[in-house]
Amino acid sequence: EEIGGIVPAEGITYEEISPQEAFLVRELRRRLSEHMGESSCFMYTKADQFEDWVKQRENNGDRIFVARDEEKIIAFMELSDSAENFVTEHPSMKNICGAYCLPEYRGKNIFQNLLNYVILILSREGSLYLGVDYESMNPTAYYFWRKYFKPYTCSVTRRIDGGEDRC
């Protein structure tokens, strides 16, 4: 069934899940964390840090949209009212603060359609802008997001606590 110009692949559906169902994307969050720890990102997260982080994410009330292949969740996109810089604090702006698609489903327009679905829902609700922050050392994110979004800020970071800077 076509949804606002989105023609899902056979068996693929898109929906928003409730905050109480946030645990349903836990495995995809783990896969995202593993991806960020691999080359070329090297943003490794220890198991206990991941558990603390995922509990916080599951309880923060952010909106989560998913793509399913039949009943299996194959991709998610998490949205927040705020993000990493002051520009995102506009009432008509929403921010993607987490996203992942299983590798075997990439290149099939599934994630693009999930993004289109999110945009459709947000525009119906009156949002005017959608932003996304991503790590520039993550080539998967860099090439995907820049196809669909225009850069509007530039941020840099420097570790100052004497620890190892892996960026």
Tell me what each language-model feature is.
Residues E1-G11, Y142, R146-F149, T153-G163:
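Acyl-donor-binding surface of acyltransferase catalytic domains
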Residues T13-R30:
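A short beta-loop-alpha structural element at the N-terminal edge
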Residues E34-W53:
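Conserved GNAT-fold acetyl-CoA-binding loop/helix
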Residues L122-Y134:
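Conserved GNAT acetyl-CoA-binding A-motif
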Residues E89-P103, T157:
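Conserved acetyl-CoA binding element of GNAT-fold acetyltransferases
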Residues V66, K72-D81, N95, Y100:
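Conserved beta-strand in the GNAT
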Residues D52-V66, N95, K150-T153:
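A short helix-loop-beta-strand connector motif used in the catalytic cores of GNAT acetyltransferases and
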Residues C101, G107-R124, K147:
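Conserved acetyl-CoA-binding loop-helix of GNAT-fold acetyltransferases
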